Amino acid sequence: MSTIEAIYLVDTNGALLLQLESRGRTSPITLEHIKNELFRYKLRNEEPPFILHNKNFLIFQELEEDVRLCIPTTCDTEPLYIHDIMRRIVDVVKTFFGGFNASKVEKNVCVIVQLLAEMIDYGYATCMEPNALQDIVPLPSFMNKFMAVTGLQTNTPTLARDTVPWRTAKAKYATNEFFIHVLERVSAVYQPNGKLAFGTVKSDMECKCQISGMPLLLLSLRPGTKLGNVRFHQSVNLKRWKQHPDQIEFIPPDGKFTLASFQTDFATQKSLPVVVEAKNKLDGRFEVRIRNTGKKSVENLKILITIPQALKSVTVTEGNYIFRASKYTHMEEGILEWSVKKLAWTSPALVLTGFLAPLKKDANSTEESSSYSKLEHLDLQYKLQGSTLHNFKVESLKMLNHPDKKSYKGVKHTIIAQNVSFRFR
């Protein structure tokens, strides 16, 4: 297993906020190199890559709010492992302090160092669950007062941490509640004739548990439900799930967590409610039409079109648009962004029309030719509440160790189109 040699938290200006060395002293050159690399990318107004290379070591870095988390390593390390460690560090700090910004880190450096020391022991990941860490590391004084006012206990036995490391034993609520939110993230590519060329749906079961004690829950799905490429939270009883694929038995963490993630082929699911027609026309003209064929309104709809040359004019029937010039070339290319706050299912088709300027005869000429570039594709993004693309359905949620108690509050579904592309005719 790869080891974590050091952890650095720096702000957007490169100032060091926190430093933890888990395997002895690291060279001061490491921190200086991190600062120099980040400053170099900042001068170019570019976001640095996840991995920064040096002849003696690698630096893994990621920006969260206004704090950059950096982990250097001198040996071969799996990037996904480091990324998972980073996400868990961010989740823990957010759980304790409500955010991961520079001001919160500066005010709570001592507690964060204690948390990191418990999470990383001599370079190895040990206790990474926020609920378990709350039993080990004392909460800040403000949080202690808040928990006292709300009636939550701060002194708990360590037995629960040993048996169920992902759940704190001090969970106590006046009313027991359990919420489920299924997020379906769609990635798809459509051909010019409107037919699907490729598509996948990645679904996450986001849960929020507010149940006192140590509940044992049984989530029953619609009979015959099969979850493809599924990844469960460590609390799930896999033995029972293998015997009964439509039942999920688990002891939930306290608060928010992802119970399961699974992926399905979009071709076997329902079609998207938003239909897009994109056409190249004569003399540099192009047209985009959007229709809502579903029964619910689509929110925060956004169309992104890559424009390969100068843009003369744009007209839209609804919404706003903006043209963003490319940061990486001196040409007149860029991204045309069309935003619509809400597209009701009763609305007529929305239309965007535009005109491209003629191409230059050559790179050094100011004269225009009679030829035009053709647009290749556009990207669609939107959010649709209360709808689902597959037949996934929760039938019931029972508390096995307390059958008389009811905590289930229902399921909410959201479709998020984040990587959906339509090719122009």
Curated annotation (Swiss-Prot):
CDD domains: AP-3_Mu3_Cterm, AP3_Mu_N. Keywords: Cytoplasm, Cytoplasmic vesicle, Cytoskeleton, Golgi apparatus, Membrane, Protein transport, Transport. GO terms for biological process: endocytosis; Golgi to vacuole transport; intracellular protein transport. PROSITE patterns: MHD. It is a peripheral membrane protein. InterPro entries: Adaptor_comp_med_subunit (IPR050431), AP2_Mu_C_sf (IPR036168), Clathrin_mu (IPR001392), Longin-like_dom_sf (IPR011012), MHD (IPR028565). Residues 175-423 form the MHD domain. It is found in: Cytoplasm, Cytoskeleton, Microtubule organizing center, Spindle pole body; Membrane; Golgi apparatus; Cytoplasmic vesicle membrane. Its main location: cytoplasm. This is AP-3 complex subunit mu. GO terms for cellular component: AP-3 adaptor complex; cell division site; cell tip; clathrin adaptor complex; cytoplasmic vesicle; cytoplasmic vesicle membrane; Golgi apparatus; mitotic spindle. Belongs to the adaptor complexes medium subunit family. SUPFAM superfamilies: Second domain of Mu2 adaptin subunit (ap50) of ap2 adaptor, SNARE-like. GO terms for molecular function: clathrin binding. The keyword Cell membrane does not apply. Transmembrane segments: none annotated. Part of the AP-3 complex, an adaptor-related complex which is not clathrin-associated. The complex is associated with the Golgi region as well as more peripheral structures. It facilitates the budding of vesicles from the Golgi membrane and may be directly involved in trafficking to the vacuole. Pfam families: Adap_comp_sub.
